[in-house]
Amino acid sequence: MSSNLANKLRVGTKKAHTMAENVGFVKCFLKGVVEKSSYRKLVANFYYVYSAMEEEMEKHSQHPIVSKINFSQLNRKQTLEQDLSYYYGANWREQIQLSPAGEAYVQRIREISATEPELLIAHSYTRYLGDLSGGQILKNIAVTAMNLNDGQGTAFYEFADISDEKAFKAKYRQTLDELAIDEATGDRIVDEANAAFGMNMKMFQELEGNLIKAIGMMLFNTLTRKRTRGATELATAE
């Protein structure tokens, strides 16, 4: 019997997804305005977040539910290390630090892993499915905006172990639907996914100060004034 979790997550996070895509930093990024100093701080935050998520998922490799959604092909830690080496140099570990919003995000991942590991599914869904869905578009924007013509700095968006991203996403969603969870657990996973979108938004918002310094408040306001319809909202409309 299907849990219908994939559709619950898609419908239940639609508003949060759209809100995240309307954060100023994200809107500027999608319009091709990316400032390298801000972007590398985001990469550093992602390194801590994905490291925590992947470590905690691995801790539950024998869990009857969490283990089903733990696909090693999705792991981003190693690709983020490559990007950090590019943006910061060989001693990147000595230079990066976790922002307050990033720290709250990591703490939440550690907390639910210890108390209700099924909720890790929400964080996997929020990050990995988004990475697969928009990865190539974001990669191309980053390459153009930051003049990354040497093929480096975008390893995060490359899934070397996934040959067909569309087929993999379908498999991922099917796996969500096959999870042996009750309705209450499914609802808590949807709630946690909405919280995860909120934590991502806070990380993006932290970066807006640096971006405004780089491009100026007038341009920032021009780029972010109009509300953008989110990807999930457009899909529903179609």
Swiss-Prot record:
Source organism per entry reads Nostoc sp. (strain PCC 7120 / SAG 25.82 / UTEX 2576)
Q: What class of enzyme is it?
A: oxidoreductase
SUPFAM superfamilies, per the entry: Heme oxygenase-like (SSF48613)
UniProt superkingdom:
Bacteria
Q: What Gene Ontology terms for biological process does this UniProt record contain?
A: heme catabolic process; heme oxidation; photosynthesis; response to oxidative stress
Its function? Catalyzes the opening of the heme ring with the release of iron. Key enzyme in the synthesis of the chromophoric part of the photosynthetic antennae. Upon overexpression in E.coli with PCB:ferredoxin oxidoreductase, CpeS and either CpcB or PecB permits synthesis of phycocyanin-coupled CpcB or PecB.
User: What Gene3D superfamilies would the database entry show?
Assistant: Heme oxygenase-like (1.20.910.10)
Enzyme Commission identifier(s): 1.14.14.18
Keyword set includes Oxidoreductase = yes
**Record's Pfam families?**
Heme_oxygenase
A molecular-function term among this protein's GO annotations:
heme binding
Cysteine disulfide partners in this protein: none
What is the name of the protein in this document? Heme oxygenase 1
Family to which the UniProt record says this protein belongs: Belongs to the heme oxygenase family.
Keywords assigned by UniProt, alphabetized? Heme, Iron, Metal-binding, Oxidoreductase, Photosynthesis
Q: Keyword Oxidoreductase: yes or no?
A: yes
Query: What is the name of the gene encoding this protein?
Result: pbsA1
What catalytic reaction does the record list? heme b + 3 reduced [NADPH--hemoprotein reductase] + 3 O2 = biliverdin IXalpha + CO + Fe(2+) + 3 oxidized [NADPH--hemoprotein reductase] + 3 H2O + H(+)
